[in-house]
């Protein structure tokens, strides 16, 4: 499986834990540029990845207001589509915010699924849309928990800014949520760029306590981990992909 826009590899990690062999493509985080990358055709069974989503998120309006249009991240979904077309895999999976346009790749039928991290055993309320493309239009049947936490943690923010209450049914008021260890916390948390905040983000994303990003500043660590797919969400999707491919 080829991973595009891998970042620190959280989606890759989830797929690897479900038995896939993942090869990481270039990422600006490590000095690579997707725009100059051309994957070989016919070498990969699948392609996964989540192009930067800021342009389609609610954060975009804030960035425009404060910094101007030129500071809003570019739409790189077309680069993802180009790489899929060049690689010609059996299947592809794109992770994005719900508001982003779906990938349109000639020769593939795309099925979409909205998934919230807490629905599949995760700790957070993060909601993402997964677009699964195959030649024959296979569905993506993601297993969801019958019962899950009614007050999940707010999604980890790449900005390291204020954690806002985005739990299901949230109306903007502060709520009590719980840490992964069961302790209560307020729905509003100031995201100071501290090592403690990073450790909380590591836990919220479903990573082991020992997880670290040596060589990065704390602010860079928080940004990188906030851009990643929570492990529970990634594993649920990876399992669904595997089962879809194995279904005759």
What are these regions (language model features)?
Residues 14, 82-86, 240:
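A generic secondary-structure signal
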Residues 148-248:
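C-terminal target-recognition/interaction regions appended to catalytic cores
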Residues 12, 16, 36-46, 53-194, ...:
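Class I S-adenosyl-L-methionine
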Residues 8-9, 13, 232:
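Glycine-rich SAM-binding Motif I of class I
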